[in-house]
C-alpha cells in the first residue's frame, strides 16, 4: 500500500461543514483488517502538508526520500495498491479557489509512473471529489474511483478490493481526457477565467456529457460509466 490518502483523514471537512467522527477507518486500516498486518507493507510515497484552506503548507518531509522509499516497497511487494487523488486542502477539493490544474498534485502522476516501472502489478485507488488526469491509465491493472466515503471508507474500500462487495456505482459526470475538452475552455477568456471579474456561461445547457456528445469529443470515462465483478444485460421483464 502506497500513498498518503491511505492514511489521511478525509471525512472531517472544515468550517461550517466540519465533522468530528468518533472513529474514521482509513483505507490502510481496512486493508490490514482484511489481509493481516503481516501481509501489508506501507509507505507514504508523497505528502501534502497540514490541512489548510487559505494557502498551501509544506509537509516538512523530503519528497525525493518518500519516492525512493515507495519504489523500495513496490519492488518488494507482490501487488501495489496506490491510494492517491486529492484532499480538502487549498486549491484542491476546497471552497474559495480553483485547482491549479487537472493533474494529480504532489508529483503523484510521476510517482505512479515510476512505481509501474518497478512493479507492473499495480492498481490505483483515487480518493477525490472531482476528475483528474490519468496519463498512466493504460499501464495499470485496475482503477477504482473511491470519492470521499466518510468514516467507514477503509472498510468499504477493502470490501470491494477483496471481493466481498460488488462495485456497482456509476459516474455522475464525464471525466475528460484533458481540461480543454470541457465546454468552459472552448469560448476563450470570457468563459474562463473571465474578464474583469465576470464570467460568461456561453456553453448554456451544453455542459458535461451534452458538450461531449454535441462536439463529438470522446471522454476518458463517460457519464454513467462503471464496471463491476459481474455482467448485466437489459431485456424484457
For every predicted segment, state its role:
Residues 43-138:
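Hydrophobic helix-and-loop "lid/oligomerization" segment in the mid-to-C-terminal part
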